[in-house]
Amino acid sequence: MDLKFLDFEQPIAELEAKIEELRHVGFDNEINISEEISKLEEKSRKLTESVFSSLSAWQISQISRHPQRPHSRDYIDLIFQEFHELHGDRAFADDPAIIGGLARLDGAAVLVIGHQKGRDTKEKIHRNFGMPRPEGYRKALRLMRLAERFRLPIVCLIDTPGAYPGINAEERGQSEAIARNLFEMAQLQTPIVCVVIGEGGSGGALAIGVGDRLLMLQYSTYSVISPEGCASILWKSADKAELAAEAMGITSERLMELGLIDSIVPEPLGGAHRDRERMADNLKTELKRNLEELAALPMEELLAMRYERLMGYGVYEEPAT
């Protein structure tokens, strides 16, 4: 897979292009230039470390949307076994923007649910760019209730720019579907681990994001609105997106400081798309650890902690009158 580089990665891209050019020269002319290539590879690694050691919130936002970043289905295939997808909300339709089904995690039965964005143009349209409609959230809730009935732990993979704001979605009760999921997930009598793997966009993310543990991949984001949307509202221009990203505190590091997430899953150097297998291994380790810890807790304690966590989001104090 040919790597695609973001604008701020151009110095790295130029160095990688030189390395690739040398490889072709050596192969075509049967010249051993492995030593030169090794030196350039080490230089590229150090440059990547330097660039990624001081990323801005806006740059991290770009990485979270990288076109080659692994999606929910990628992690399902790499982490879980015997995945059997389930379809439909049993009320209106099946929404491809949400995928979910039964699977095994090293032998243990689980239910997995996630947003799915799509890769090429055809699939992106089919998946509605990862923006679920009401039937997607109702499908997710149907599967969660199934998991509760059979005492299966739930893993939710979050990666969406937000819930679909179209007229048809609103007519079918988009806000009710999201609110219903929040209400029901707070009471489900089974462990829930949620992971932001890319974009965590507003209520569209939170609708499958109420759980006992909330993890974020290192270069994922979680916010009430996109930086561009925030900039358009506050400064009347999407050009201020970089400023908005910094002000909103959308990164895993900032949210960890605020106590809104439980842990950060480290990504390979350069981002999850650079080494999907390694990223999946890192996430699998964290999922197993958290599920084992939650399985040891009494259900009453689990539900009380989950409710307290949900009520702690967005707390503010009104000034005395």
Swiss-Prot record:
Annotated function: Component of the acetyl coenzyme A carboxylase (ACC) complex. First, biotin carboxylase catalyzes the carboxylation of biotin on its carrier protein (BCCP) and then the CO(2) group is transferred by the carboxyltransferase to acetyl-CoA to form malonyl-CoA.
The protein's name: Acetyl-coenzyme A carboxylase carboxyl transferase subunit alpha
UniProt GO cellular component terms: acetyl-CoA carboxylase complex
Cellular localization per UniProt: Cytoplasm
Provenance organism: Methylococcus capsulatus (strain ATCC 33009 / NCIMB 11132 / Bath)
Entry keywords, A to Z: ATP-binding, Cytoplasm, Fatty acid biosynthesis, Fatty acid metabolism, Lipid biosynthesis, Lipid metabolism, Nucleotide-binding, Transferase
Catalytic reactions of this protein: N(6)-carboxybiotinyl-L-lysyl-[protein] + acetyl-CoA = N(6)-biotinyl-L-lysyl-[protein] + malonyl-CoA
Superkingdom of the source species: Bacteria
